Amino acid sequence: VLSAADKTNVKGIFAKIGGHGDDYGAETLDRMFTVYPQTKTYFPHFDVSHGSAQIKAHGKKVVAALVEAVNHIDDIAGALSKLSDLHAHKLRVDPANFKLLGQCFLVVVGIHHASALTPEVHASLDKFLCAVSTVLTAKYR
């Protein structure tokens, strides 16, 4: 459960991300595909090479979903319900991949905002990403 302080921390770090979200999304996917190559299996139709247009486009979607969750931080499940349905019923993505993606996003944020990612903010962002992961995997049951 996200505390009031967690919500403030998450909103604050996303404010710092600002207009860099699309780049961070692509960087997150690139990192995930490099560190966890098994995740590429869900993207057989993608050019998963560094900097590809498809990676950039999907990275933009990933960050847009995270921003949607931040904007509805008190109802993440409602905000991401359709996305949860898509991943559970149509795409059938292994639920473990959401946690891998979240960890890669944390690394990217840390690279670009090291001074802002204090231990408290890091913990809050991790809790938020875990909450998003939980929502996205809830409909697998």
UniProtKB/Swiss-Prot annotation:
InterPro entries: Globin, Globin-like_sf, Globin/Proto, Hemoglobin_a-typ, Hemoglobin_oxygen_transport, Hemoglobin_pi. GO terms for molecular function: haptoglobin binding; heme binding; iron ion binding; organic acid binding; oxygen binding; oxygen carrier activity; peroxidase activity. GO terms for biological process: hydrogen peroxide catabolic process. Heme b binds at residue 87. O2 binds at residue 58. Red blood cells. It comes from the Eukaryota. Residues 1-141 form the Globin domain. Gene3D superfamilies: Globins. Signal peptide: none annotated. Belongs to the globin family. PANTHER family: HEMOGLOBIN FAMILY MEMBER (PTHR11442), HEMOGLOBIN SUBUNIT ALPHA (PTHR11442:SF48). This is Hemoglobin subunit alpha-A. It comes from Eudynamys scolopaceus (Western koel).
